[in-house]
């Protein structure tokens, strides 16, 4: 499972000219389920995101998590994070999960994020969405559960 996180002062997502999700300070999380992913990857990614220390403490160091700051999370599905751009000029998306499985894992991810106690807003899976944000920092991070799986396998 892949996620692109942005620390934001504010973010919103609009579908058909209506705002369906909106947060103040916190994280905007674009998420994509990959072929072969399961609920285990969703759980792993949620746990990492909820505890990732990318918010400033009183000394100005990135030492606090979104949970520590009582921040909110806006989760937006984005299958294009699964793009393969290694050859040619047109991205391929065969590594992203099939739409039905992608939707199931997206909803699983959102439910698990809510279980952390954080305030969670969401986009609409598969919809044409307009996302607005004020990036704070800027701080933008890429997470991929496959990276952790490969690292763990090699550290044995």
UniProtKB/Swiss-Prot annotation:
Pfam families: Tyr_Deacylase
One GO biological process term: D-amino acid catabolic process
Molecular function in Gene Ontology: D-tyrosyl-tRNA(Tyr) deacylase activity; Gly-tRNA(Ala) deacylase activity; Ser(Gly)-tRNA(Ala) hydrolase activity; tRNA binding
InterPro entries: Daa-tRNA_deacyls_DTD, DTD-like_sf
Keyword Hydrolase found: yes
Residue span of motif Gly-cisPro motif, important for rejection of L-amino acids: 137-138
Sorted UniProt keywords: Cytoplasm, Hydrolase, RNA-binding, tRNA-binding
Top-rank EC class of the record's enzyme: hydrolase
Matching Gene3D superfamilies: D-tyrosyl-tRNA(Tyr) deacylase
Entry-linked SUPFAM superfamilies: DTD-like
EC numbers on record: 3.1.1.96
Compartmental location: Cytoplasm
Quaternary structure (record): Homodimer.
Entry similarity comment: Belongs to the DTD family.
Role summary: An aminoacyl-tRNA editing enzyme that deacylates mischarged D-aminoacyl-tRNAs. Also deacylates mischarged glycyl-tRNA(Ala), protecting cells against glycine mischarging by AlaRS. Acts via tRNA-based rather than protein-based catalysis; rejects L-amino acids rather than detecting D-amino acids in the active site. By recycling D-aminoacyl-tRNA to D-amino acids and free tRNA molecules, this enzyme counteracts the toxicity associated with the formation of D-aminoacyl-tRNA entities in vivo and helps enforce protein L-homochirality.
Free-text comment on this protein's domains from its UniProt entry: A Gly-cisPro motif from one monomer fits into the active site of the other monomer to allow specific chiral rejection of L-amino acids.
Name of the protein this chain belongs to: D-aminoacyl-tRNA deacylase
Lineage of the species this protein comes from: Bacteria, Pseudomonadati, Pseudomonadota, Alphaproteobacteria, Rhodobacterales
């Amino acid at each position: 499972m892949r996620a692109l996180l942005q620390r934001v002062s504010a973010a919103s997502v609009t579908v058909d000219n209506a705002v369906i999700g909106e947060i103040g300070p916190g994280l905007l999380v674009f998420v994509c389920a990959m072929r072969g992913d399961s609920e285990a990857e969703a759980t792993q990614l949620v746990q990492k995101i909820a505890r990732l220390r990318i918010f400033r403490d009183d000394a100005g160091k990135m030492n606090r998590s979104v949970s520590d700051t009582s921040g909110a999370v806006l989760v937006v599905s984005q299958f294009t994070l699964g793009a393969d751009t290694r050859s040619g000029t047109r991205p391929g998306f065969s590594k992203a999960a099939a739409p039905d499985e992608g939707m199931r894992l997206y909803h699983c991810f959102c439910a698990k994020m809510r279980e952390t106690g954080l305030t969670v807003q969401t986009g609409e899976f598969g919809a044409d969405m307009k996302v607005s944000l004020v990036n704070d920092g800027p701080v933008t991070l890429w997470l991929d559960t496959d990276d952790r799986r490969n690292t763990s396998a090699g550290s044995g």
